[in-house]
């Protein structure tokens, strides 16, 4: 069933708390992304506040859930299984066959749509919804309204058909009149045989006209029925995301009056930022949620009567905001606040610049790189020209940002606002947040997400551990990194993220220069097979970043907007990791249809195939089956496109 009210959640939490008296009764299953980790952090803080024992198990896909079913669920002490971003879109009772009558799976998942079996299950599965299921009901009403409009359009089309039919009848009447005139031709008047033949011919023609008219109407009716059926089918096939699990979990904490526990608000901000960075939600959805969090943050961190805290903390907004090293200073009005605080702030759309240098940050950031087309000499010249017009020497922008002359750092935002539009860089900022630590150091929400994600998808090639052991170790490092006590771990993640982004840009340049991208009718695709490149891209989120970059690169070159299929060979498994991307923020498309096409192609070709995450648009296909899999995918999507 679906749970949507705070009252019911309070009741459910009381049940979880009551069961905890028996021992370690809560098992938390967590997917491998920053949003899931942030949501888990919120949940564990809540559980710890009530002295509820718990066990955390990281899961990367369906196989891990099956392993949980065959091992952990046999523990009779476990009463509650809380699933974060790892159960909403699959039938839980099919996977957790060992659930006993005393166990309940609680799902907090941003993946949409929900499995219908989870919704209808009345005993062992409960979805803690963010409100989007209600919205889906409302959307169903809108859909019904839309169908009414469609019926009205069909009626209009029918009226047009009537007009066409009347025109045809008029034409036929005219022909009949001409024939009648011919019958009364004086030359034919004396021929009785003509009268007989004409009369018989007239009856046959009339029957043919009626038959043709009926066939025509039947064809139109079938065509309209097929179109309507297809539209309904497409609505069910698309996957998309609801609110981040961390945002949902924070909302639930407010229902329990536990929202003031340490760092819960920051974890929620990270969950929202993760969805934005990885383009799982629309810009409009992000902006609306940003406003909500901004209000919460301003209420939690008052500024001594200053109603516009956000303006006071926009980077570069005021020279007095900087110290002698060019770093943002703590505002005097906040000195009475102890510990860390969150600050609403504009963030640049060139990534990690605080921990990098300006030149490489702009060069490797997708937005700037695609606008300037830095894979070409002209694009690189434009980037250098931008700095020249801003009056910042290259030796300044190519050194660590922290070492830059404070004067240039102070003027950066203003100079970009003036000169950026000359190069098509008109949207260089987005609304975000900074976390200011008690020691006066700071990190942005976006940089934190980049770092946590990089830690989770890093490789230890020198280790003798199995892939499973390595990624579980990575998960715990990522989990620990967002704690205030592990700033050093975050710094490692920042370095790894910078290295990954450089490799992504290099790979994009290489693919464009080598013409490695193939246009396959309804989509473009490319596969990475060179050993030196593979270690970076055998991870879902890293490969997704590359695919989004490639998609925007082609759009920037004036190519038609098309979905993108990106794959990387995993030599150890002799298989390809494949990510299907339907759209990005630049295409205004956030839903994804690849999941259903992948499933159909795998079934039809009998390919060795498995899901590599809980996102159905990320799969693993055997190397030997790749060609027939992609070939069928092309045929299926081509047929769908033609039939639209």
UniProtKB/Swiss-Prot annotation:
A GO molecular-function annotation: single-stranded DNA binding
InterPro entries in UniProt: CDC45 (IPR003874)
Pfam families tied to this protein: CDC45
Chain residue ranges for the region called Disordered: 141-235, 301-328
Start-end of Acidic residues biased regions: 144-205
The entry's keywords: Cell cycle, DNA replication, Nucleus
Cellular component aspect of the GO annotation: DNA replication preinitiation complex
GO biological process: DNA replication initiation; double-strand break repair via break-induced replication; mitotic DNA replication preinitiation complex assembly
Biased composition (Basic residues): 210-233
Subcellular location: Nucleus
Top-level taxon of the source organism: Eukaryota
Main localization (coarse): nucleus
Family: Belongs to the CDC45 family.
Role according to the record: Required for initiation of chromosomal DNA replication.
Protein name per the record: Cell division control protein 45 homolog
């Amino acid at each position: 069933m679906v749970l949507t009210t705070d009252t019911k959640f309070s009741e459910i939490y009381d049940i979880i708390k009551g069961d905890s008296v028996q021992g370690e009764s809560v098992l938390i299953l967590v997917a491998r992304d920053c949003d899931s980790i942030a949501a888990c952090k919120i949940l564990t803080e809540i559980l710890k506040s009530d002295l509820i024992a718990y066990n955390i198990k990281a899961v990367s896909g369906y196989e891990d859930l099956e392993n949980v079913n065959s091992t952990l669920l046999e523990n009779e002490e476990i009463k509650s299984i809380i699933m974060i971003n790892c159960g909403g879109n699959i039938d839980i009772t099919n996977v957790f066959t060992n659930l006993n009558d005393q166990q309940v799976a609680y799902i907090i998942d941003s993946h949409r749509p929900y499995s219908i079996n989870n919704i209808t299950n009345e005993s062992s599965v409960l979805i803690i919804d963010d409100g989007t299921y209600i919205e889906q009901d409302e959307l169903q009403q809108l859909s019904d309204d839309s169908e009414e409009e469609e019926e009205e359009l069909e009626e209009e089309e029918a009226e047009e058909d009537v007009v066409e039919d009347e025109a045809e009848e008029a034409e036929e009447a005219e022909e009949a009149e001409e024939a009648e005139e011919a019958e009364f031709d004086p030359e034919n008047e004396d021929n009785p045989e003509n009268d007989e033949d004409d009369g018989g011919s007239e009856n046959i023609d009339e029957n043919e006209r009626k038959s043709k008219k009926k066939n025509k109407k039947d064809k139109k009716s079938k065509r309209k029925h097929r179109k309507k059926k297809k539209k309904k089918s497409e609505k069910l096939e698309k996957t998309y995301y609801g609110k981040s699990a961390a945002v949902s979990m924070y909302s639930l904490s407010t229902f329990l009056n536990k929202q003031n526990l340490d760092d819960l608000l920051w974890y929620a901000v990270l969950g929202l930022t993760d969805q934005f960075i990885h383009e799982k939600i629309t810009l409009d959805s992000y902006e609306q949620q940003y406003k909500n969090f901004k209000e919460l943050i301003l209420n939690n961190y008052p500024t001594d009567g200053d109603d516009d805290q956000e303006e006071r903390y926009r980077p570069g907004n005021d020279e007095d905001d900087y110290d002698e090293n060019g770093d943002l200073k703590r505002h005097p009005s906040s000195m009475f606040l102890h510990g860390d605080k969150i600050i609403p702030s504009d963030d640049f759309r060139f990534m990690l610049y605080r921990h990098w240098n300006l030149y490489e940050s702009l060069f490797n950031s997708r937005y700037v790189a695609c606008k300037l087309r830095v894979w070409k000499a002209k694009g690189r010249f434009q980037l250098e020209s931008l700095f020249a017009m801003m009056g910042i020497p290259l030796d300044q922008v190519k050194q660590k940002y922290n070492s830059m002359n404070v004067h240039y750092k102070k003027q950066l935002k203003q100079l970009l606002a003036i000169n950026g539009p000359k190069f098509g860089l008109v949207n260089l900022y987005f609304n975000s947040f900074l976390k200011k630590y008690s020691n006066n150091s700071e990190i942005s929400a976006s940089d934190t997400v980049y770092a946590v994600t990089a830690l989770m998808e890093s490789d230890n090639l020198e280790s003798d551990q199995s892939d499973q052991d390595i990624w579980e170790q990575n998960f715990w490092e990522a989990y620990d990194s967002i704690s205030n006590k592990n700033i050093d771990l975050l710094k490692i993640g920042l370095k790894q993220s910078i290295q990954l982004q450089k490799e992504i840009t290099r790979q994009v340049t290489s693919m464009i220069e080598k013409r490695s991208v193939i246009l396959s009718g309804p989509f473009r695709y490319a596969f990475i097979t060179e050993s030196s490149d593979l270690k970076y891209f055998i991870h879902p989120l890293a490969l997704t970043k590359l695919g989004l970059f490639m998609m925007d690169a082609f759009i920037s070159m004036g190519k038609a907007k098309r979905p993108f299929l990106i794959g990387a060979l995993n030599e150890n498994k002799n298989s390809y990791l494949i990510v299907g991307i339907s759209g990005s923020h630049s295409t205004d498309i956030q839903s994804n249809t690849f999941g259903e096409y992948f499933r159909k192609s795998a079934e039809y070709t009998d390919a060795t195939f498995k899901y590599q995450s809980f996102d159905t648009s990320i799969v693993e296909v055997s190397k030997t089956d790749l060609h027939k899999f992609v070939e069928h995918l092309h045929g299926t999507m081509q047929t769908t496109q033609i039939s639209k």
